[in-house]
Swiss-Prot record:
The chain crosses the membrane at residues 35-55. The lineage of its organism: Eukaryota, Viridiplantae, Streptophyta, Embryophyta, Tracheophyta. This is Probable xyloglucan galactosyltransferase GT17. Its EC number is 2.4.1.-. It is found in: Golgi apparatus membrane. One of its GO terms (cellular component) is Golgi membrane. GO terms for molecular function: glycosyltransferase activity. GO terms for biological process: protein glycosylation. Its main location: Golgi.
Length: 455
């Protein structure tokens, strides 16, 4: 196989007579000045509101679809303090960044193109908002709780957790989660199975909700509460050893199609794009972490290889925050290296698969123990695993994989794209199961198999 660095580009007022002009000139100037002042004030107010409260929570109903799944889901209408009320403080929902642009458009973020678009600059920790918007418009939603198979509790727990991450008063850090659990466990429908048919969807990792009594790393105790342990908790990263009620859902990427045709067009494009690079790495080094060593090694090997494209992310580098730049690197590559980041999992994995790039993992907890609802049982069919302890020469190992194997693996990766993608909440003519459909189907099956109802 030959590889090179060739780039692939994926009305005016009518005038009055002189007498009228003279008579009203002074008044007219006063009116003009007043109007201009009002216009300026309105513009300033509009700009302020746009920058500070740009979110839209408009669960606009799409064209009605038939429920093609064998389940119904009930959505609790929670007090606003548990979800959309949090967005009023969007500038302070994250200690590192202003989240106002990111909570716009029901969590999809800012559009990457003008007009109606399916591409957005979506924040990696915003899945809970997108999930909420999708379920609100889901064809299998029921407004009759007595007919529901599963019950969705739309708590924006991730956004709340990140807003109080540095709160030293642990009681205050936990208080909203505690109020939520007290509220939901007091509902009639909780009592029919003690919450075992209820679920949360959280956009952050499970570690942010598992503070024990003797440790404090910024987390709250939501997932440690006994009543929550009865529920199913969907999260972008589960605790892989003891999180029996944790279920991994994909990190949101940038593509949220309105129609099935858009998805199929994208898949065809990824099947046919030229991939001049054997492999690539998008990421930066880590300090003070066990995972730092493998990251440093990946950066080193990629930088030294003529077959690897490196997009190094340091000090919040803007290129790494440009979705099209990131996807461009991945679409030019056959394999994409996926080292653990601050935790085991990475949004980059889902960006890579969206770009049709075969992921290479160095820890089983980056993918294999996380997203079982979404992936084939045969891990080797869509990915490569290299144990980080084996000091593997990455380029040599990847070159051992035959061209036919690469083609087959890439086809499976591209076939997986729809189920790893969050369709647009207002999608129309979209009949491919997306990330939300997959999760709801699995939750309903689990409830039917395991829940004993008593009222």
């Amino acid at each position: 196989m030959t590889f090179n660095k060739r780039q692939v580009k994926i009305n005016h007022w009518p005038e009055k007579n002189d007498k009228e002009k003279q008579k009203y000139s002074k008044n007219r100037e006063t009116v003009k000045l007043t109007l201009l002042t009002l216009l300026l004030l309105c513009s300033i107010c509009f700009l302020f509101l746009t920058l500070n409260f740009p979110f839209t929570i408009e669960f606009t109903a799409s064209i009605p679809r038939t429920c093609d799944h064998n389940f119904t889901v009930y959505v609790y209408d929670l007090p606003k303090e548990f979800n959309i009320g949090l967005l009023q403080n969007c500038r302070h929902l994250n200690i590192y960044t202003n989240m106002c642009p990111h909570v716009a458009n029901n969590g999809l973020g800012q559009p990457l193109h003008r007009g109606r678009t399916s591409w957005f600059s979506t924040h990696q920790f915003i899945a809970e908002m997108i999930f909420h918007a999708r379920v609100e418009n889901h064809p299998c939603r029921t407004y009759e709780p007595d007919t529901a198979d599963i019950f969705y509790v739309p708590f924006y727990g991730g956004l709340y957790a990140s807003s109080v991450f540095r709160e030293q008063n642990l009681t205050k850090r936990d208080e909203l989660a505690v109020r939520l659990v007290n509220y939901i466990s007091g509902q009639r429908w909780w009592k029919r199975s003690n919450g075992r048919d209820h679920f949360l969807a959280i956009g952050r990792t499970a570690w942010d909700f598992m503070r024990s009594s003797d440790t404090d790393f910024g987390a709250n105790m939501l997932m440690q509460m006994p009543r929550v342990m009865n529920m199913s908790v969907l999260t972008v990263e589960r605790q892989p050893w003891n999180g029996d009620n944790h279920f991994g859902i994909p990190y949101p990427s940038y593509f949220h199609p309105y129609t099935s045709a858009e998805m199929v067009t994208w898949q065809d494009k990824m099947k046919n794009v030229e991939r001049p690079n054997l492999f690539s790495f998008v990421g930066g080094p880590r300090k003070g972490l066990e995972k730092a060593a493998i990251r440093d090694e990946l950066i080193k090997q990629c930088a030294e290889s003529s077959h690897c494209e490196l997009l190094k992310c340091e000090n919040g580098g803007s290129r790494c925050h440009n979705p099209m730049t990131v996807l461009g690197v991945m679409a030019r590559s056959r394999f994409c290296l996926q080292a653990p980041g601050d935790s085991f999992t990475r949004r980059s994995t889902f960006d890579a698969m969206l770009a049709g790039c075969i992921p290479v993992f160095f820890s089983p907890h980056t993918m294999y123990t996380q997203y079982m609802w979404y992936l084939p049982d045969d891990k080797r069919s869509y990915s490569v695993f290299m144990d980080e302890k084996n000091n593997t020469h990455i380029e040599q190992e990847l070159l051992r994989i035959s061209e036919n194997e690469v083609v087959q693996m890439r086809e499976i990766v591209i076939d997986l794209i729809p189920r790893l993608t969050y369709a647009h909440p207002n999608s129309t003519n979209y009949d491919l199961p997306d990330a939300v459909d997959i999760a709801l189907e699995a939750l309903a099956k689990q409830a039917r198999d395991n829940v004993v109802v008593s009222l």
